[in-house]
Amino acid sequence: MKNTDTREVIMISIRLSDKNLQADYYPFILEPEARHLFLKELASHFAARTDLLDIQQHLDEILLTLDGRQTESYTFALTLPRLISITLDTCNACGKNQQWFRSLSACIAMDAGLSRPIRLFISDTIPPIIQWTGLHADRVSTLTQEMTAGNSPSCLITHALYKRLSPSIQSKYATLYYIHHICCYGAEL
């Protein structure tokens, strides 16, 4: 893929948050381990997929970029909330067995539209840094940041993604929300 390749993408933000289950327990070192375990479990859902273009992990957020030119990518994206719920259950069970006294939860936002990868090559030993054009990453990141306050469902799709869905699937996302002037539709995890 060249820097000039503009394509239809599905941008997904998964923002993790954790809850302390014991008032006097402060596991500073275990939070990165919990995020690593979640990412490892999440990666297993993408092992056989060819439509994953990019995955980036930030402190409490994972940004996924799927190829939006494939119809099945939209179907798969809409199954992600269920897969993430299963992944969270696995991670929380593991944490409980390890006596971490933390519980992970996630908020998910999805957007779709045209984007183009911009690759920055630093050296032969370091993989290129990829940044996607368009506001899709910013929009989903803004949504999940606001969703952590708990004032909306744990899964939102933007109108740009909504209009690409069949009417039968659209009916499952019937509740309209406006968050930071972003029109989106909600569903619970």
PLM regions and their residue ranges:
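Amphipathic alpha-helical regulatory segments at dimerization interfaces
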Residues: 41-48, 83, 90, 94-97, ...
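Generic recognition of short, well-ordered alpha-helical interface segments
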Residues: 79, 135-138
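Short glycine-aspartate micro-motif
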Residues: 11-13, 105-109, 156
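Intrinsically disordered, glycine/charged-rich C-terminal tails and inter-domain linkers
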Residues: 1-11, 116, 139-142, 147-189
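Catalytic NTP-binding/metal-coordinating core of nucleotidyl cyclase/transferase enzymes
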Residues: 2-79, 86
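Alpha-helix/helix-capping structural signal
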Residues: 17-19, 113-115, 160
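Catalytic core of nucleotidyl cyclases, primarily class III adenylyl/guanylyl cyclases
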Residues: 51-75, 91-134
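Short amphipathic alpha-helical segments
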Residues: 25, 122-123, 169
